[in-house]
UniProtKB/Swiss-Prot annotation:
Highest taxon, organism lineage: Bacteria
Protein family: Belongs to the PhyH family.
InterPro entries from the UniProt entry: Phytyl_CoA_dOase-like
Name of the protein described by the UniProt record: Probable alpha-ketoglutarate-dependent hypophosphite dioxygenase
Gene3D superfamilies per UniProt: q2cbj1_9rhob like domain
Record-listed E.C. numbers: 1.-.-.-
Any one GO molecular function term: iron ion binding
Keyword Cell membrane attributed: no
Gene that specifies this protein: htxA
Organism: Stutzerimonas stutzeri (Pseudomonas stutzeri)
Alphabetic keyword roster: Dioxygenase, Oxidoreductase
This protein's record includes keyword Nucleotide-binding: no
Purpose of the protein: Required for hypophosphite oxidation.
Length: 286
């Protein structure tokens, strides 16, 4: 059913399916997102769940991101485990699949960019059968900060995501670490209507510009991995880790593949969250 998208994913490192979710299905998701937004009222600063846009170093009341909403909101937990999503994932990851994380990026008007990076630098595993599935909750265009991916970059090197002067890990690639294979002008914007789904490989280079429009760009992102991909930084509580299985069977015999990798250390002075950590990047693209 998704043969064309499979070929594109293997070749480019990403693909998209427009209107994968119907208007009615997205409306239901947005009902839950509204409750999540209401939960941010009264929150004064970033916490474990909510992150806010910053202006001149000061926290605003503009919601930037909700971290791991599946842990706190039953409806989102049901969505990330839904048969509709899992059936799609089987075409890319096989039968045995584990949920890794989730987040909603809100990108309000004037919302900040996300500098170019590879997710693989953040959470290395024993193999890279690992992807992020995204759902457009608003119509998404270049003007309101659509994500761009660099075709074929998932087959290449893993770049250093550290400040070249201080050595601190900043969740982004300094321009001085770029080479001829990293040219953001060759990136492909993933745009589309509400309900569009994107999938990008964990090693794919990607980033997104600021929101220059008057329309926010809400983007639900969900990470999934093959069940035999073991997190090299540890799994935390093993019971919680096992509860993240969404399809098939788990294993205690990880599949090890020789791959380029790095580890996300030493931590940035701004912490381990991408938006704040990228403040430590001195050679930005956006």
């Amino acid at each position: 059913m998704f043969a064309e998208q499979q070929r594109e994913y293997l070749d480019k490192g990403y693909t998209k399916i427009e209107s994968f979710f119907s208007a009615e299905e997205v409306a239901k998701i947005l009902e839950d997102v509204k409750q999540i937004e209401l939960g941010a009222i009264g929150v004064a600063s970033d916490n474990e769940t909510y992150q806010f846009e910053k202006k001149n170093g000061e926290t605003t009341k503009l919601l930037r991101r909700v971290e791991n909403p599946h842990l706190y909101f039953d409806a989102i937990d049901s969505l990330v485990r839904s048969e509709k999503i899992v059936d799609l994932l089987r075409h890319f990851l096989g039968e045995n699949i584990r949920l890794h994380n989730s987040k909603i990026n809100f990108k309000p008007p004037s919302g900040a960019p996300v500098q170019w990076h590879q997710d693989w630098a953040f959470y290395p595993h024993t193999n890279d059968d690992f992807l992020t599935l995204g759902i457009f909750l608003d119509e998404t265009s270049e003007k309101n900060g659509a994500m761009a991916c660099l075709p074929g970059s998932h087959k290449g090197k893993v770049y250093d995501h550290r400040n070249v002067e201080t050595g601190e890990f900043c969740h982004a690639i300094s321009r001085s670490n770029w080479d001829e294979a990293l040219d953001p002008t060759e990136g492909e914007l993933l745009t589309g209507p509400v309900g569009t789904v994107t999938l990008h490989h964990v090693r794919t280079l990607h980033g997104s510009g600021p929101n220059h429009s008057t329309i926010r760009r809400r983007f639900l992102l969900i990470g999934y991995a093959a069940a035999d991909a073991w997190p090299l930084l540890g799994c935390g509580n093993y019971g919680d880790y096992e509860s993240l299985m969404v399809s098939g069977r788990s294993t205690v015999f990880p599949r090890m593949v020789e791959l380029p990798l790095t580890v996300p250390y030493p931590l940035s002075m701004y912490g381990d969250r991408i938006f704040e950590s990228q403040r430590a990047l001195t050679q930005k693209y956006y």
